[in-house]
């Protein structure tokens, strides 16, 4: 994973953890947890692509990797919709900028995961 993406994830997670939303903080904590999970999943897919032949060990280790991949895309779509919703309702510029960056990062990560998964297929 490139260092800009790592710092983008870290920056957004730190900024989101500092935000106090009018709605429940559980919602935001859930988003943060999903961002972290998504980052780890994307990293592991990227590492699998980097190692030649690792696809076979990935299949042996986890025969349901396609199902996991599908679930991750569902999570990404949910996060994108949640971030878009937050963008529509927020009036705070700090929150707006944070959610804009989160949306951009989600779209980039979705594209990277798609690229990794096509290489594994």
UniProtKB/Swiss-Prot annotation:
Cite the SUPFAM superfamilies for this sequence.
Answer: Nonstructural protein ns2, Nep, M1-binding domain
Q: Cellular component per GO?
A: host cell nucleus; virion component
Keywords, alphabetical = Host nucleus, Host-virus interaction, Transport, Virion
- In chain numbering, motif Nuclear export signal lies across 12-21, 85-94
Q: Which GO terms describe its biological process?
A: exit of virus from host cell nucleus through nuclear pore
InterPro entries associated with the record: Flu_NS2
What Gene3D superfamilies does this protein map onto? Answer: 1.10.287.230, S15/NS1, RNA-binding (1.10.287.10)
What is its subcellular localisation?
Virion; Host nucleus
Q: What is its main location?
A: virion
Q: Among its keywords, does the record have Transport?
A: yes
Q: Which cysteines are joined by disulfide bonds?
A: none
Assembly, in brief, is: Interacts with protein M1. May interact with host nucleoporin RAB/HRB and exportin XPO1/CRM1.
Which family does the similarity line name? Belongs to the influenza viruses NEP family.
**What does the protein in this record do?**
Mediates the nuclear export of encapsidated genomic RNAs (ribonucleoproteins, RNPs). Acts as an adapter between viral RNPs complexes and the nuclear export machinery of the cell. Possesses no intrinsic RNA-binding activity, but includes a C-terminal M1-binding domain. This domain is believed to allow recognition of RNPs bound to the protein M1.
**Misc. comment:** Average number present in a viral particle is estimated to be 130-200 molecules.
HAMAP family in alphabetical order: INFV_NEP
The protein here is known as Nuclear export protein
Give the organism, scientific name: Influenza A virus (strain A/Hong Kong/212/2003 H5N1 genotype Z+)
């Amino acid at each position: 994973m490139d260092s800009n993406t790592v710092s983008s994830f870290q920056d957004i997670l730190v900024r989101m953890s500092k935000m106090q939303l009018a709605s429940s903080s559980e919602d935001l904590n859930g988003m943060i947890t999903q961002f972290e999970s998504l980052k780890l999943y994307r990293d592991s897919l990227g590492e699998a692509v980097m190692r030649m032949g690792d696809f076979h060990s990935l299949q042996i280790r986890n025969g349901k990797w396609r199902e996991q991949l599908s679930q991750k895309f569902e999570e990404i779509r949910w996060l994108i919709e949640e971030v878009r919703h937050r963008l529509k309702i927020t009036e705070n510029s700090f929150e707006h900028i944070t959610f804009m960056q989160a949306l951009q990062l989600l779209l980039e990560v979705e594209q990277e995961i798609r690229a990794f998964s096509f290489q594994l297929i």
